Regions:
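N-terminal amphipathic/basic-hydrophobic helices that include classical n-h-c signal peptides
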Residues: 1-17
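Soluble FAD-dependent oxygen oxidases
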Residues: 14, 19-33, 37-560
Length: 560
């Protein structure tokens, strides 16, 4: 089967088909070269070759690498917040050696610990693509002036510059060897506004409720401030440890994007440090081109975002989820089940109430991991009744895990204390002494912490495939795909079926417009355990990883 899907031009953020609730995010970032060239006259760019110093970055050991005195001046300029980096695994022996190594191994499955280490990333690498390696130095920025100093230093000394907040980039853009890192982790202030008007937009835009968030804040901090304590909603990511700035710059899907749209579309204003070292405000009225570009143009592509202001919305009465799994006894029964699920989704779930995913496994099992908003538990159960009645009436199927709906008052969705009391085990605490009590991770996301990616394929599925005459073709393609690898349909990562206002807002971003016509994003992915250089224990089996990646390639080919 060929050409029935629209493929994305960049691997999208956050979610896998490996029983992950919502893998956070990935932004396709490019160097700051366009900014470096912005001051060169256009005629000169066209007529003369670029100077060699603009064509390459200086590395340690080369004559132009900054001297100790140069680094000392930068350290002074940033108030002492310049760090020389080394991986905590650098001192590990065949089993373990040294306090730093032991501490890193102790917290290997804790993404909050990993995010607090400037030398580590949330992903340890991708076979035949990249391996996590720390920058040479990092500026632990606490304010915009620190970022300006780092950008100027990198430009003047022709260093590669890397930006890291949450450190979730799948493409390895959260780190780079021999580079200078702008580490925004400590720029995590959050302020709520009852009536925000973007700078220069008075009389053009009506004041509206909003939240201003520092570039280093995680979404769990934003949700705690806006929802748990503030009683409102901000569109962000599903994975709680993902950084706010990176997600917005890469488009930004969350569990409820089918109703609230993309995170980037909710951006009202940003402070950005451009490659010439200027801190500027970007919004619809001031630097509108830059404002448009950072809404989905890729994290760190056009400058270093230091602060964002996002609109907030009213909460629905309820958030909730539906989970379970159905197994077919034969290939033929599985093909029929896939077709039934597609028809059921089109008739009952293809609307702004429903998000997250349904997975089709190579073991002839359909796995449901959906969320909903604006419905009661009874209404959610009623919506699923037609499919469950059909399954129960046929001996070819087994409800391996009963499909059940659960709802809770929306304000409790990210309330860690509520879950500790009423649903222990659904969230995992940051277990370090003194850690903030609101720092929790969804238990279903823990498998991604430090993961070593073997393969990650994706394709947006156009809504035209849900038409009655096209559903059989889609079912055939999904079945063929599942013979090679499991595939997850992430409905919240396609905006077809979203409210018209959210479609219009998404259209005014730099995100690939194919998302507007897609009812879901198909994701085919696989990984292995953490594989940071220097870690004790077995090394990744690269031959096996490549075999798995090839199988994923065959699976996505069945969809295309």
């Amino acid at each position: 089967m060929r050409r029935i899907v629209a493929t994305s031009t960049a691997i999208p953020l956050k979610d896998g088909a490996m029983k992950r609730r919502d893998l956070l995010k990935a932004a396709l970032a490019i160097p700051l070269l366009p900014g470096l060239l912005s001051g060169i006259p256009a005629m000169a760019q066209a007529a003369d070759p670029l100077p060699a110093r603009l064509r390459s970055r200086v590395r340690p050991g080369e004559p132009d690498w900054p001297s100790a005195a140069d680094w000392g001046r930068l350290k002074h300029d940033v108030g002492g917040r310049l760090l020389k980096l080394e991986s905590p695994f650098a001192g590990c022996g065949p089993t373990s050696a040294g306090a730093a190594c032991d501490e890193a191994l102790k917290h290997l499955d804790n993404p909050f610990y990993r995010g607090d280490q400037p030398a580590l990333t949330q992903t340890s690498g991708w076979v035949d693509a990249w391996t996590s390696q720390p920058s040479a130095y990092a500026v632990a920025a606490e304010g915009t002036a620190d970022v300006v100093a780092a950008v100027n230093f990198a430009r003047e000394h022709h260093l590669r510059l890397v930006v890291k907040g949450g450190g979730h980039s799948y493409q390895g853009t959260s780190d780079a060897p021999d580079s200078l890192l702008v580490w925004t982790r400590h720029m995590n202030e959050i302020s709520l506004h009852d009536a925000f008007t973007a700078q220069g937009c008075a009389g053009v835009q009506a004041p509206q409720p909003a939240v201003s968030i520092g570039a280093g804040a995680m979404w769990i901090d934003a949700y705690d401030a806006v929802t748990t304590r503030g009683g409102r909603y901000v569109q962000g990511g599903g994975c709680t440890t993902v950084g706010v700035a990176g997600l917005v710059q890469s488009g930004g899907f969350g569990s409820f994007s089918k109703h609230y749209g993309m995170a980037a579309a909710g951006l009202l204003e940003a402070e950005v440090v451009t490659a010439d070292g200027r801190a500027c405000i970007a919004n619809a009225c001031t630097h509108p081109d830059l404002f448009w570009a950072i809404k989905g143009g890729g994290g760190g592509s056009l400058g270093v975002v230091t602060r964002l202001t996002l609109r907030t919305r009213e909460l629905p009465e309820f958030f909730g989820g539906v989970s379970g799994s159905i197994k077919a006894v034969s290939d033929a029964a599985y093909r029929a089940l896939i077709a039934r699920v597609i028809g059921f989704y089109q008739s009952s779930l293809f609307n702004p109430h429903w998000g997250e995913q349904i997975g089709f496994g190579s073991d002839n099992t359909v796995r449901v991991d959906m969320v909903f908003q604006g419905l009661s538990q009874a209404q959610a159960e009623q919506a699923w009744a037609p499919l469950l009645d059909w399954v129960r009436a046929r001996k070819e199927y087994e409800l391996v895990k009963p499909i059940q709906a659960r709802a809770l008052p929306a304000r409790y969705m990210w309330d860690a204390e509520f879950f500790r009391q009423h649903a222990p085990g659904v969230q995992v605490d940051d277990d370090r002494p003194g850690a903030p009590r609101n720092h929790v991770l969804w238990a279903g996301d823990q498998g991604q912490v430090g993961w070593f990616i073997h393969g990650y394929k994706s394709a947006w599925l156009p809504a035209s495939l849900l038409r009655r005459k096209q559903q059989a073709r889609l079912a055939d393609a999904l079945f063929a795909c599942s013979r090679h690898w499991g595939v997850g349909l992430h409905f919240n990562k396609g905006l077809a079926g979203a409210p018209k206002a959210e479609l219009a807002a998404a259209r005014n971003t730099a995100t690939n417009p194919q998302v507007l016509d897609a009812f879901a994003l198909a994701i085919i992915a696989g990984d292995g355990p953490p594989a940071f250089p220097g870690m004790p224990g077995p090394k990744p089996d690269l031959a096996h990883a490549r075999e798995r990646a090839a199988a994923m390639g065959r699976a996505i080919a069945a969809l295309r």
